From Swiss-Prot:
Protein name per Swiss-Prot or TrEMBL: Biotin synthase
Cofactor: record remark: Binds 1 [4Fe-4S] cluster. The cluster is coordinated with 3 cysteines and an exchangeable S-adenosyl-L-methionine. Binds 1 [2Fe-2S] cluster. The cluster is coordinated with 3 cysteines and 1 arginine.
GO function term, MF aspect, one: 2 iron, 2 sulfur cluster binding
Any GO BP annotation: biotin biosynthetic process
Signal sequence coordinates: none
Organism encoding this protein: Acinetobacter baumannii (strain ATCC 17978 / DSM 105126 / CIP 53.77 / LMG 1025 / NCDC KC755 / 5377)
């Protein structure tokens, strides 16, 4: 399928409105054109600083604006992060993602995160961070330290965004993605479904992502995990079929991107997840927790992979890895 960055909302809506089986069939066809069938990229996500975030994202347990009963934690030691990364690699993860509950990293935090990137990279894993908004200098220093991916989700459509967050703008998020691109890193950016948004908002989110100058290399599609004490604690749960439709449409309009199953997966059956893989999802977060929300554990994931005949993708060699191999030849 031809790579496009000029999708219209009308075209994306037409995909959403296809009969479900036709949509999933098309998505699987597109997936097999661009990726190895039955292979899933596995990532692990670790919270390196938890809670007391100054942002007011209405879905988030880490926001200081809400009483979610979350116990805040200070930055964890780099040595602890490396230990967790080694365990993740041993369990089959090819990418290690590190997240901090910050609006943006302060300059005093930069030596800490840069050391972390270098140490995890030295393990032979792909590296990813989500630290909030970045400026251009911070993005460039992260790239120089060896960071492969930077995650900064758009969360929802531009139109619905102000219903969810007021402490940073939609364009603030786009600016950070631009800084990441200019620095030469890969982009991880997606959103959350089930926030009380309409299908038109889900279309709007995917339209924003698919019309970026370069599609995000990874697109996480989160299902809201309602957190007691947050404004969205009692929001009506989105139908799983609608979530899978969103995955399928994302696969079709961003054919080269990894489509990742993220938050909300622990509540899904094996059959639901199998349908999501059929719809073109080819990445997931493994481990018992995603930052502060529960997640399917590694044992459950391996059992699911065995049941479905899936294998975990191996880490891709970096330019530096290839250079070392060439020198050794």
């Amino acid at each position: 399928m031809t790579l496009r960055n000029d999708w219209t909302r009308e075209e994306i809506q037409a995909l959403y409105e296809q009969p479900f089986l036709d949509l999933v069939f098309k998505a699987q066809q597109v997936h097999r054109e661009h990726f190895t069938a039955n292979t899933i990229q596995v990532s692990t996500l670790l919270s390196i600083k938890t809670g007391k975030c100054p942002e007011d994202c209405k879905y988030c347990s880490q926001s200081a604006h809400y009483d979610s009963k979350l116990e805040a934690e200070k930055r964890i030691a780099v040595e602890k992060v490396i230990s967790e990364a080694k365990a993740a690699k041993d369990s089959g993860s090819s990418r290690f993602c590190m997240g901090a509950a910050w609006r943006n990293p302060h300059e005093r935090d930069m030596p800490y995160v840069l050391e972390m990137v270098r140490e995890v990279k030295a393990l032979g894993m792909e590296t990813c961070m989500t630290l909030g908004m970045l400026n251009q200098s911070q993005a460039e220093r992260l790239k120089d330290a060896g960071l492969d991916y930077y995650n900064h989700n758009l969360d929802t459509s531009r139109e619905y965004y102000s219903h969810i967050i007021s402490t940073r703008t939609f364009d603030d998020r786009l600016n950070t993605l631009d800084y990441v691109r200019q620095a030469g890193m890969k982009v991880c950016s997606g959103g959350i479904v089930g926030l009380g948004e309409s299908r038109e908002d889900r279309i709007g989110l995917l339209h924003e992502l698919a019309t970026l100058p370069i599609h995000p290399e990874s697109v996480p599609i989160n299902m809201l995990v309602p957190i007691e004490g947050t404004p969205l604690a009692d929001v009506e749960k989105l139908d799983v079929i609608e979530w899978i439709r969103t995955i399928a449409v994302a696969r079709i309009i961003m054919p080269h991107s990894y489509i990742r199953l993220s938050a909300g997966r622990e509540s899904l059956s094996d059959s639901d997840q199998a349908l999501a893989f059929m719809a073109g999802a080819n990445s997931l977060f493994s481990g018992d927790k995603l930052l502060t929300t529960p997640n399917a554990g590694e044992g459950k994931d391996q059992a699911l992979f065995n049941k479905l005949g899936l294998t975990a993708e191996k880490p891709k060699p970096t330019v530096s890895d290839l250079s070392v191999d060439a020198m050794s030849a």
